[in-house]
Amino acid sequence: MEKEEQSYRKSKNIVGIIQSCLILILIVLIIFIMVNISRLQGTARVINYAGMVRGATQREVKLEITENQNDELIKYLDDIFLGLRYQDGHYDLVKLKDKEYHDKLQILSDYWEELKKEIKAVREAGYQNTDIVNMSEIYFKMADETVSAAESYSERIAVKIRTLELLSVLDMLCLVILIVIQTLAAMKMSVLNKLLEQRAYTDA
């Protein structure tokens, strides 16, 4: 009986240590999940505004071709680029930690500056005497690639969140199993103690 008590105490201590480790791991996993969810929410705004850049630029080009100048729309696009590249401006945009996206955004931003020069040329000489249509098509493809890069980054975060959630579930399952094992061991020990008491009473 004494050996069983020692074995029970030893196993209880081991289970307690494992439980503490699993709880600590669970806390860390939950923190990582929260951080990645926050990143995912910020990424959604970036994707939205990157898509708006694509659409708004096409609209600006069409307006210029039809001789409807819109400097406010150009300023609006400039502000979005400031937000996307430097997290400046009024749009509360986050910086995506993805090199491919930033490389494509840099190329797109540089090409936007060239496109603005071409818009100025359209106003001075008419769109027939410029390369505005071809440039806008190239720009659209660049913008599409930039949005795709942001979407790929977003998907990677989503996959990471799903993986962390799965690990959290497994962690909690292990905790439940340990609690069940601990409960069964305690019940077994309780039964043994009662049997010992009964024997002691009978012997007396």
Where are these regions (language model features)?
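Short, Lys/Arg-rich, polar N-terminal cytosolic tail immediately upstream
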Residues: 1-9
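Extreme N-terminal signal-anchor transmembrane helix of membrane signaling/transducer proteins, especially
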Residues: 9-36, 169, 173-176
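Membrane-interface helix-start motif
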Residues: 9-15, 150-169
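Membrane-proximal amphipathic alpha-helices
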Residues: 35, 39-50, 69-70
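Extracytoplasmic
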Residues: 47, 52, 56-65, 103-162
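Extracytoplasmic ligand-binding sensor domains of the Cache superfamily
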Residues: 63-121
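Alpha-helical transmembrane signal-anchor helices
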Residues: 159-192
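Amphipathic HAMP/coiled-coil signal-transducing linker helices
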Residues: 191-204
